[in-house]
Design a protein with these regions (language model features):
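Acidic donor-binding segment of Leloir-type glycosyltransferases
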Residues: 129-174
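Short aromatic/hydrophobic "clamp" motif used to bind/position activated sugar donors
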Residues: 194
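Conserved nucleotide-sugar donor-binding catalytic segment
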Residues: 1-73, 282, 292-297
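A recurrent flexible, glycine/aromatic-enriched loop bordering the glycosyltransferase active site
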Residues: 1-5, 17-19, 177-180, 187, ...
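C-terminal, non-catalytic tails of nucleotide-sugar-dependent glycosyltransferases
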Residues: 61-108, 222, 232, 244-271, ...
Length: 386
């Protein structure tokens, strides 16, 4: 629903040169002029799609795809947004991938906290150098109380192999504090962008950094998260839903890597409330603006807390499925199973809920309120209209 005044301001009704996607083209023009877009999160009516209609499968009318791409390119041109390409996302008819022009491929400083488990770290670092196509990066290994002699021999070898792009800095703190480690490592970063990365990850897609930087460079964007897979090729991270389980949860967790997800959400870039810091890219200036990670969250929820603060500062967080890595989660630290770890976790949950009570009550604008917030799989929990 929109006003006649808005349609006139946007240049009039549907244009038939975009036949097949003429409504899409109109909506793009409307968004350029609208002050705000409002979505009513209730099932107000049902839409029946017939076989062969674009509502059921746009591939039934391929000319619609070409018209949609043309409409989107025209939209970018009117808005002054530089793009290299717009293409249909394979297997997801009606969804398009935009390759934004990277105006300036600024240096990415990759911060990797690490403590022994040198084989995991070697896999991570070797995959970065062997598979990454991004032209300017540095790796900062944040040494955290390692004991094994082979760890330090590996550090020396890595620095000799990559003298210009890899350095090791030693954190003098005790125990494990992911926030403090990254805040310490950030002091040594020379890049325009910071990439927080766990040492138990492995790069899959060569253009992973290009895919993340093309969004992180945009003024409106804060954090950018990647698609992370478990070793069995199921989803570990595809964006974080705010309020799931009373705090936050990973959307589509344990879905097969090949799944389209709910409404194709595993196939396209989208705004999300938060991302995991296991692989998180952000401009260094924003990291400094919000004060880095909160060191009172040693292990859990430091990333979600950070993302909330980035949102409160006026930025949008993004998930892209086109940057993919394996994440051998918690291998290097162990799971929170001991009584002490459970107590620490429960304390962090309580503190998080108290700090962000207002935001939790308001809900996640990237999730329809008709989803069951006790689950991460987009199960419906339809609320009747009163």
């Amino acid at each position: 629903l929109f006003s006649r005044r808005l349609m006139d301001a946007a240049g009039g009704p549907e244009r038939m040169e975009y036949n097949g996607s003429q409504d899409y083209e109109l909506f793009l023009r409307l968004t350029e002029k609208a002050r705000k877009i409002v979505h009513i999160p209730h099932a107000l009516y049902y839409w029946r799609s017939s076989p062969g209609s674009t509502a059921s499968d746009i591939s039934a009318k391929t000319y619609c795809i070409d018209a949609g791409i043309a409409a989107l390119k025209a939209h970018y041109a009117r808005c002054g947004v530089a793009v290299d390409d717009v293409s249909l996302i394979p297997g997801t008819p009606g969804y398009y991938k935009t390759d934004y022009t990277i105006d300036h491929p600024g240096r990415v400083s990759i911060l990797i906290p690490t403590c022994d488990h040198i084989r995991d770290l070697e896999t991570c670092v070797e995959s970065i150098y062997a598979r990454t196509t991004y032209p300017d990066l540095e790796i900062i290994l944040i040494e955290n109380n390692s004991k094994a002699p082979e760890t330090f021999r590996a550090y020396e070898r890595m620095q000799k192999e990559h003298p210009d792009t890899l350095k090791v800095v030693t954190w003098e703190g005790k125990g494990f504090n992911y926030s403090a480690l990254n805040n310490f490592g950030e002091k040594f970063a020379t890049g325009e962008y910071l990439l927080l990365l766990n040492n138990d990850t492995e790069v899959i897609t060569a253009a992973w950094l290009e895919e993340m930087v093309m969004y992180a460079q945009q003024k409106r964007v804060g954090c950018v998260g990647a698609k992370l897979l478990y070793p069995d090729d199921t989803i570990q991270h595809a964006g974080v839903g705010f309020g799931i389980g009373g705090v936050a949860g990973h959307l589509h967790k344990y879905f097969p890597a090949t799944s389209d997800g709910y409404m194709g959400r595993l196939n396209y870039v989208q705004d999300v409330y938060a991302d995991t810091a296991a692989c998180l890219l952000i401009r260094k200036e924003i990291y400094d603006e919000v004060g880095g990670l909160d060191e009172s969250y040693a292990v859990a929820f430091n990333d979600v807390d950070f993302c909330v603060r980035v949102r409160e500062a006026g930025h949008t967080n993004v998930f892209t499925p086109f940057a993919q890595l394996y994440h051998y989660e918690s291998k290097s630290r162990g799971l929170d199973e001991s009584p002490a770890k459970r107590k620490r976790f429960e304390s962090e949950v309580k503190r998080f809920q108290q700090r962000w009570a207002k935001q939790l009550a308001a809900g996640d604008p990237c999730l329809n309120p008709n989803f069951d917030l006790m689950k991460e799989d987009f199960t419906f929990d339809i609320k009747p209209l009163e």
